[in-house]
């Protein structure tokens, strides 16, 4: 048979599938992986959980600001807790993780709001809309659903460098317009001095 003939009797990937691998679970290497259990961070997990727990009863929870050196488990602990929270809250809690350092995600206020609305299954037009309209759509989306939205903003210092602090302040102020819904922010940074450089109104809103 020729190179593209029909003489093959088995799937060309069968060798790959049956070949031994050194990985027990290769998915664990992915940035999006959240383990079923985290060791040696029980106190931190308990602290985050206690802050977010009121959402399960429909109450407002405080925003959270987490900072520490790289590799200390800030992101994985936060994602672990909110995954558990989302599971416990069933359809009443929606958790969204955004690494704001990534290009075309956290480099403009519009793209961040667009991403949030898409996570809520909102149909977004291809053409741009004014950010004030996107804020109104976000308020309507969470209020109509009656959900608590937990938003993790990783590398939040990169977000401030790109678009300033008005986005965070505006998000925290949305709660004043909500009755059935809640929005909680979790900001994460490796920059230990970042919080000291924030405007006082942002400090108080982030907790």
Question: At which residue positions do the language-model features occur?
Answer:
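A generic secondary-structure signal
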Residues: 50-55, 84, 140-141, 173-174
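Charge-rich, low-complexity intrinsically disordered linkers/tails
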Residues: 82, 87, 192-193
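Walker A/P-loop nucleotide-binding motif
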Residues: 59-80
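A short, basic N-terminal segment
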Residues: 3-60
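Short glycine-rich or small-residue beta-strand-to-loop segments that form or flank ligand, phosphate
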Residues: 65-69, 98-101, 157
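Conserved beta-strand scaffold positions in the cores of enzyme catalytic domains, especially
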Residues: 63, 95-97, 207
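Mid-core helix/loop region of P-loop NTP-binding domains shared across ATPases and GTPases
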Residues: 9, 13-24, 30, 61, ...
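AAA+/P-loop NTPase substrate/partner-engagement loops
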Residues: 86-116
């Amino acid at each position: 048979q020729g190179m593209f003939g029909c003489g093959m009797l088995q799937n060309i990937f069968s060798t790959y599938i049956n070949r031994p691998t050194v990985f027990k679970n290769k998915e664990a290497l992915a940035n999006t992986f959240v383990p079923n259990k985290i060791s040696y961070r029980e106190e931190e997990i308990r602290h985050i959980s206690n802050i977010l727990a009121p959402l399960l009863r429909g109450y407002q929870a405080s925003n959270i600001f987490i900072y520490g050196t790289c590799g200390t488990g800030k992101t994985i602990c936060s994602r672990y807790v909110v995954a558990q929270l989302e599971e416990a809250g069933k359809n009443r809690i929606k958790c969204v993780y955004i690494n704001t350092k990534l290009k075309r995600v956290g480099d403009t206020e519009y793209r961040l709001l667009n991403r949030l609305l898409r996570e809520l299954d909102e149909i977004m037009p291809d053409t741009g809309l004014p950010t004030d309209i996107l804020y109104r759509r976000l308020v309507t989306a969470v209020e109509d659903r009656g959900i608590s939205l937990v938003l993790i903003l990783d590398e939040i210092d990169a977000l401030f460098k790109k678009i300033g602090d008005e986005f965070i302040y505006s998000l925290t102020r949305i709660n004043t317009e909500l009755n059935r819904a809640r929005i909680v922010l979790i900001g994460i940074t490796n920059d230990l001095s970042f919080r000291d450089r924030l405007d006082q109104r942002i400090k108080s809103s982030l907790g």
